[in-house]
Amino acid sequence: MAGKLTLIVGPMYSGKTTELLSYVEIYRLGRKKTIVFKPSLDNRYGVDCVKTHAGVEVEAIAVEKSADAMKYIKQPVDAVFVDEVQFFDKDLVKIVRQLLDQDVDIFCAGLDMTFKQNPFETTMLLMSLANEIIKKKAVCHICGEYNATLTYKFVQDDSEIDIGGKEKYIAVCRDCYNKVASKND
C-alpha cells in the first residue's frame, strides 16, 4: 500500500508549522519512525529544529538541496515531515513520489503563494500529488478578521525569497491586501 501525502498550506502566521508538528507528535506517540526536514536557508529559530511562533519545537535536519535529504532517510521510516517546502527545489517532488511508493507517509507545510500572490513552484507541484490539502488561514493583521489567506511584505525589498518574520511580513485578507497594495503603488 502506498504512503499518503498531506500538504498544509496558507499565509504566514496561519499555524502551518503548528499543524505539521501535531502530526509529528501523533506519529511518535504511535511509536512510528519519523524524520523531520527543513531548508538550511531558514535559520530563524536555529539550524537544527523546526519551531512554531509559539515556541514549540522539534529536532530537524536542515538540508540545502532536496537530494541531500535522502542520505538521512534510513529504511524503514514510517513518516517524513518537511517544513517550509516553498524554499526547496522541485527535486523534492521526485523524492516525495519515491517515498510514497515505498509506503512512507509524507507531511509537508509551507506557503502556497509569495507576497506578490505568485505560486511557489515546489508547493504547487506537491499539490498535484497530495492526497489531502489543508488550506490554513490567519487573523488579518489589519482588520482583525479570521480570513487572511495572503501574506503582505511591508518592507521595501522586492525579493520573493526573503526569510523573515514579523519584522517584514503580515497576514492579510484580500480586501486589506488590495487596500494596502494600492496605497503603495
Curated annotation (Swiss-Prot):
Keywords: ATP-binding, Cytoplasm, DNA synthesis, Kinase, Metal-binding, Nucleotide-binding, Transferase, Zinc
Single GO MF descriptor: thymidine kinase activity
Residues in the signal sequence: none
Enzyme class: transferase
SUPFAM superfamilies membership: Glucocorticoid receptor-like (DNA-binding domain) (SSF57716), P-loop containing nucleoside triphosphate hydrolases (SSF52540)
GO cellular component, one term: cytosol
Name of the protein this chain belongs to: Thymidine kinase
Gene coding for it: tdk
